[in-house]
UniProtKB/Swiss-Prot annotation:
Role played: Peptide chain release factor 1 directs the termination of translation in response to the peptide chain termination codons UAG and UAA.
Gene name of the record: prfA
Cytoplasm found in the keyword field: yes
SUPFAM superfamilies reported for this sequence: Release factor (SSF75620)
Keywords noted in UniProt: Cytoplasm, Methylation, Protein biosynthesis
Record's subcellular location: Cytoplasm
Disulfide bonds, paired cysteine numbers: none
InterPro entries linked: PCRF, Pep_chain_release_fac_I, Pep_chain_release_fac_I_sf, Prokaryotic/Mito_RF, RF-1
Protein known as: Peptide chain release factor 1
Amino acid sequence: MLADRLKPFLKRYDEISESLSDPKILSDISLVTKLSKEQRSIEPVRNATLQYLEVLKNIEDNKSLINDTELGDLAKEELKNLEISQNKLEEEIKILLIPKDPNDEKNIFLEIRAGTGGDEAALFAGDLLDAYLRYAELRGYKTEIVSQSEGSAGGFKEVILLVKGDGAYSRLKFEGGTHRVQRVPETESQGRVHTSAITVAIMPEIEDSEIQINENDLRIDVMRASGHGGQCVNTTDSAVRITHIPTGLVVTNQDGKSQHKNKEAAMKVLKARLYDLQEKERKAKEQSERKDQVGTGDRSGRIRTYNYPQNRITDHRINLTLYRLDAIMAGGLFDEIIDPLIAHAQAEAINKSEI
C-alpha cells in the first residue's frame, strides 16, 4: 500500500528535525548543512504524504456515514471529491518518488556544433544559440559564452555556452542530440529547401572533487588567438589548447583576455566532457535491451526537426509536432517541448520502478 511506503519519509523528517535541535549537532556546520539539505529533499514528499493520509482518513470517515439517513447523501458527494483528491495526490507522490538525477540542479555547458550542411548548418547553430539565450532569460538563468568558432558566412562552427541557474540541467538535458533543420537558405535562388544538421551536447558543470585529472595526462599548448581566416588578433600567446592524452579529447579556448583565464575555462569544459564520457560508458554498461524512448544526450540520434516552410517543429522521441516554429524560436519558448518530454520521462520512470 502506498501509505505504508510513505511513512518512513515522515519518520526520517522528524528524526532530522530532532537532530537539528541538538546543540552537539548544531556545533558541526558541515553536518548541519548535510542534514538540512536532506530535510529539504524530503520535505515535498513529507508534505504530500500528510495531505494524502488526511484524505484517506476523511474517506474512511465518510464511508462510515453513507448509510446514515441524514448525512448519507452529503457523505456520498464528499466521497466523490475526496477520491478525486486521492487520485491526484497519488500521481503527485509517484512523481516525487522517482529517483532524482544527481545532476538536475547543476549548471550546464551547452555545446552546439554545426554538422552536415556547411554554411547553412553554421547559420542555424547561431539561430539555435539565440533561441536558447532567450529561453535562459525567460527562466532567469545566467549565461556566458565560454568558447566560440564562427562560421565563414556567419553563425558558428562550434559554440559552448555556460548556463547557470537552479535546475538548468533538469530543464535542458533533453536537448542533447542531433537537430535537423529544413529551410530555404538566403543564398538559394531557386527556392529549394535544404536540409542540414547540428548536434547539441548538454554537460553538467563538474566540481573539482567529482572528477580527478592526472596532470601527466594533459598536453597544454599556448598560441596567439586567431579570428576569421586564421589571422592573428592578439600579440601575446593567450589562446590555450588542452589535450587529454588517454581519451584524445581536445579543448581550445581563446575568448578570455589572459592565458590564465583561457586555461581555467578550457579545464572546466574538459572536466565536463570527461564526466560526460564516463557517464556514457557507465550507462552503456547498465543499459538493458529496451532503450529509453527519451534520450538525454545521445548525439547519434536525431531528436528534432525544424521545418521552416511548414512552420513545424517535431520532436521525434515523443512524436510531438507543433506548428509554431517561428514563435518558439523567436521567443525561446522551448518549455512547450520540454514540459511534454519531462512528463514522458516521468511516466517511463514510474512504469519502470513500479511505484
